[in-house]
Regions:
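Nucleotidyltransferase catalytic core that binds NTPs
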Residues: 2-187
Length: 187
């Protein structure tokens, strides 16, 4: 059964998550979380850049049921956003699209990252974040725990670079370079 034709039931989600979390050995995985409302070429572009720069084995697009910092008024239904993201990534085997927060019953990144690390202890995760999101990172619940738990790769976006990096300098203090992340993930 293809990823995009799974029935929308809790049982199917658990089965899908179980397959996704099956430990295939140590992998370097980039986590790109967001609303994906809608998924677009920019998501693909930063995914490809991050994979090359960080030497990632996979990138997981984690479609959030509801970003706690955004209004739900203009949000497309989760199933539609998942379908669009899967269509956009069809044929790219190293990108996985799923909604872990729906299965974990949370919409908070720190809790999602904690569960992923528990379920996949051999994998090495890196949070992928657009520079525009770095400006508001301090408003994320338990942002300090996220920054201590996983490396964060900040990806430049048009109009967001130096200003965002400056705003997040304290949060990124002591963070590793892409080359250092590769070495850490291999070790």
């Amino acid at each position: 059964m293809a990823r995009s034709d799974l029935p929308d039931t809790a049982v199917a989600r658990r089965h899908q998550h179980a397959r996704l979390f099956h430990d295939r050995g140590r992998m370097r995985i980039g986590l790109l979380g967001g609303s994906f409302n809608p998924a677009h070429e920019g998501h693909l572009h930063v995914t490809h850049l991050a994979r090359r720069a960080l030497g990632l084995d996979q990138v997981w697009w984690m479609v959030s049921p509801q970003n706690p910092l955004k209004t739900s008024r203009d949000m497309a239904p989760l199933d539609m956003r998942l379908m669009q993201a899967r269509q956009m990534t069809a044929g790219i085997p190293w990108i996985r699209v799923f909604a872990p927060e729906a299965g974990f019953r949370t919409n908070l990144t720190h809790a999602t990252v904690r569960v992923l690390r528990q379920r996949c202890p051999r994998h090495r995760f890196c949070w992928l974040m657009g520079a525009d999101n770095l400006q508001g990172f301090g408003r994320w619940q338990h942002h300090d725990i996220i920054a201590q738990t996983v490396p964060i790769a900040v990806l430049d976006r048009p109009g967001y670079s130096y200003k965002s990096i400056n705003a997040g300098r304290r949060l990124l203090k002591g963070r590793k370079s892409a080359a250092r992340f590769r070495m850490m993930a291999l070790g």
